[in-house]
Amino acid sequence: MRCWSPCSLLVVIVIYCLSSHTSEAFDLAQACVESQRLSLLPICDTIFAVQQEGAQQSADDGMRSKRFIRFGRALSGDAFLRFGKNVPDLPFEDKRFLRFGRAAPQLDDLLKQALQRVESLQKADETSVRRKRSTDAAPQNNAENPEQKNDSAKITKRYIDDVEDSDVKRFMRFGKRFMRFGRNPSDAGNKLTEKRFMRFGRDPEKRFMRFGKSDDKRFMRFGRNPSDVEDELEEDKRFMRFGRGGEDDEEEAEKRFMRFGRDPEKKFMRFGKSGEDKRFMRFGRNPDEQEADKRFMRFGRGGEDDEVSTEDKRFMRFGRSADKCKGCLEG
């Protein structure tokens, strides 16, 4: 038979002692339960008192420090993280913390709930409940000077409108449905110098996006033009233009833009400085039937002097031509 080592003997002795103490405690507890009915062992009263006191103390400690992470002392002004219910009987205040759970009902919460119920009943029954009595003096009706009062109201309204009109810059408004970025012109009559904005609404020049200082420069417009049809410069609607345009320079007014609308030169994209037919793409009918420049894409310099060299130069044409390939026959 193998000999026992000292460690194994020590383990056996410890197990035996624990088992003996456990059995004795179990027997004592069973005897105490029987003594409650028969009152045979007065020592059990002391055991039960100590047990109840320990349970109460552990419960209080568990309610005070239950499911939270605290940094420092849990007094008024300290910060901690708590996970659980709040206890109203604690000697410290629970503030500046992150809590997950329902708190115990407080007096303020009850007052808020009662006020919400009163407001809901007031809305349902359409009754007026006066919460406070104001200590201010009752307003006096000045029936002596009604005209003076009306005049002051009108003056105030005009003043507010003027201030709003002067401060209409660098803002986004969705009442009049536009977004404007830039400075407002100092002259109120000059409506064409409003620059760098996008407007969508009921405006004389409506539904467009403009970027620049001039009237017809670097903007995209979509919609009807309110001016008369007789004005040729105002007929440019539904187009996108990029460049410097002016009323005096006709060549500069129609350069580097894409236009879509009812225009003699309509539905085309042009890139160049001159009003001649150069460096552009046009799609549509030309009002002059004898002119050969329709439905084509041309890239090159155009001029009026050298007709042969400029008529059929670096372009792609799709359509019928009035002059059928004069350059090819002459070449």
Curated annotation (Swiss-Prot):
GO BP field: neuropeptide signaling pathway
Alphabetical list of InterPro entries matching this protein: FMRFamid-related_peptide-like, FMRFamide-related_np
Region of interest (Disordered), residue spans: 122-158, 282-310
Origin superkingdom: Eukaryota
Composition bias, Basic and acidic residues: 146-158, 282-296
Family annotation (PANTHER family): FMRFAMIDE-RELATED PEPTIDES
Entry protein name: FMRFamide-related neuropeptides
Organism: Doryteuthis pealeii (Longfin inshore squid)
Phylogenetic placement of the source organism: Eukaryota, Metazoa, Spiralia, Lophotrochozoa, Mollusca
